[in-house]
Amino acid sequence: MQEIYRVKTSPVALSDNMIIGEKYRITVLTEALVRLEYSEDGVFEDRATQTVLFRDFPKTGYHVVRNADGIEVHTSMLHLIYNEKEFSSHGLSIQIKGNLSAYHSIWHYGEKVHDLQGTARTLDDVNGEVELGHGVVSRFGYSILDDSKSQILLDDGWIEPRKKGVSDLYFFGYGHDYKQALNDFYRLCGKTPMLPRYALGNWWSRYYKYSEESYMELMDKFDEKNIPFTVAVIDMDWHQVDVDPKYGSGWTGYTWNKKLFPDPKRFLGKLHDRGMHTTLNVHPADGVQGCEEMYVDMAKEMGVDYENEDPVVCDPASPKFMDAYFKYLHHPREAEGVDFWWIDWQQGSNCKVEGLDPLWIFNHFHYLDNKRDGRRPMTFSRYAGPGSHRYPIGFSGDTHITWESLDFQPYFTTTATNIGYGWWSHDIGGHMLGYKDDELTARWTQYGIFSPIMRLHSSCSEFNGKEPWRFKKETEEAMEAALRQRHCMIPYLYTMNYRSYAENMPLIEPMYYEYPENAEAYEVKNQYFFGSQLMVAPVTTPRIKGLNVARTKVWFRRASGMISIQACAMMVEECWRFTGI
């Protein structure tokens, strides 16, 4: 692999932090973070994985007590008891020291972990809630990061499957010090990189058959109304879609539709002249067909029979394919002016290598490849498991246009912080199905400016556009005010962007990070800190019938004590100001 695909890692832990037996190894990385390995052949993994890059923590204070039943390991935070046999619920336990709970703060191997949750791969086709994965913080004081099935990162930049039948767990036992737990998660798995400044403004995104002319007319109208955008998201109709059926569905494509965009470089240049950056949508799954302009060159390189137009199969498990994938499909488009890619992978988590998720491959290599010309890299794709925070930005998928979907998004975005995933981009306003509701659109847009990425989106339906002037006056004014305010917040957001990188604190911070001992902080699921200076509780339910007010639950502390209120406010004006606290 090229040098650009080689990731900086430091995966070997200090020997002073290791306790090694015949078939186990315990590594005390911090006084609250312990790596637990078991391998029948007594061979342990010191290379980096997809998830874990850095195990070179400083020397840690701990002591070991050996007895007839096994060993006990003590730190200032933890008490580990282990019988030195294959990991089991009766043979391995860790207790969190301190007065957290009478019995809930003891973990036994294999038990279900009750943490404060993390995030999910996607919100595709979701109406309301979806099951969330694990995070690294818990009211019980501990959580588990299971790295047993991660692929190994090789020194040359490629990956290989790890040995089967091993246990490789990381025990996070930080009590209620959630910030420190998250900080050490980043220390272990790598920092969240900074985003380019332009990513923090407004994005215009729609699945729609635009042409160069119609797109620029739309941007002109936004300019006339003083509605600023910094990112243009061009969905799949940028490429040929109406292809001969022998080439497939046209869902995957890499050749510009010259009927719509006769001069792509000119089109992208016009957007750059406006201060906008562009991402193109790609669905890689169907490979490269004979109708693509770069097909012959890529087929020759891949050894495919191009005279018979055999397809170049999408094989992300092949380094040869991935090299050609960038060389022929993406670099030429970037030379024309494409800034980053929207990787719209929806075909599951299997490929030719067992345990290797194609989504992770595309996210990892697209992000690394995007820095090729010295730019600050970015990609735009779904979540592929712990460690995905290294490849911002996350695309949460095709949600339903319902109040239930809006009501879930603030909570979904907030819990993602618990697994270090701080840059979700949602389909603001929803993508499909559901119903047309002006109030819902206004509220969703208002929430959008206090979400990590403000990306208005809609489907190809003629009735689903998110242009503010499509809605009645009060909604139009609310949307326009929101979009202008988001643009004005770019300096603040960029400061928080740096804070996320430098201080390991995502933009969205759950209330319980600041107030872990207050039960109320866990009850206001849709309330959060938006950077260091703002607290947000968006309105995510319809206004009260017969009144021009809406209700949202808010909790905060004052010098006089703790207050829980049900806040009612005007839909557009008063609630707008309230939401912007």
Indicate where each model-derived feature is located.
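A low-complexity, Ser/Thr/Gly/Pro-enriched, surface-exposed linker/loop concept
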Residues: 5, 29-68
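Aromatic-lined carbohydrate-recognition surfaces of secreted/lumenal glycan-active proteins
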Residues: 203-206, 233-234, 272, 276-289, ...
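Aromatic-lined carbohydrate-binding/catalytic grooves of carbohydrate-active enzymes
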Residues: 193-350, 389
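Short, glycine-/Ser/Thr-/acidic-enriched flexible segments
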Residues: 41, 78, 142, 149-151, ...
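Secondary-structure transition/capping motifs at alpha-helix termini
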Residues: 223-231, 260-279, 331-339, 366-377, ...
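Catalytic core of carbohydrate-active enzymes
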Residues: 367, 387-394, 408-412, 416-426, ...
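Catalytic and substrate-binding clefts that recognize carbohydrates or anionic sugar/phosphate headgroups
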Residues: 64-199, 206-207, 212-224, 578-581
